[in-house]
A protein has these predicted regions:
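Amphipathic, interaction-prone secondary-structure segments
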Residues: 24-57
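Generic serine detector
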Residues: 18-20, 53, 95
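A short, sequence-level motif marking secondary-structure junctions
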Residues: 17, 44-51, 69-73
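Mixed-charge, Lys/Arg-enriched low-complexity segments
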Residues: 4-10, 61-96
């Protein structure tokens, strides 16, 4: 039996090149972990309820739920709006 090993993406391949890129990722149920100004965040679309959760990693009190990716882009990452920095964040993991 022959196996194919698929290499991991590079950071450049994982980054969001546009706001639409992030929206599409969330539309298809993507899961994202990213760093902005030294703080780790996560965004995921849950199947149950079909809502998007965004929060600081391991900080449940910062979790907010949104119905659309446009709404999720209004989440504040520190003092910045996610919409303004999504193409600049350091993506650590991206499922889609």
């Amino acid at each position: 039996m022959k196996y194919t090993i698929v290499p991991a993406n590079t950071p450049e391949q994982d980054r969001f090149v546009s706001i639409s890129d992030f929206k599409e990722c969330m539309h298809w149920g993507g899961e994202v972990e990213f760093i902005w100004k030294g703080t780790r965040y996560g965004a995921v679309r849950y199947v149950q309820g079909n809502r998007i959760s965004v929060c600081g990693a391991n900080r449940q009190e910062t979790e907010r739920f949104y119905d659309t990716a446009d709404e999720a882009l209004e989440y504040m990452v520190g003092e910045d709006r996610l919409r303004d920095v999504i193409t600049k964040v350091e993506v650590r993991f991206r499922s889609i």
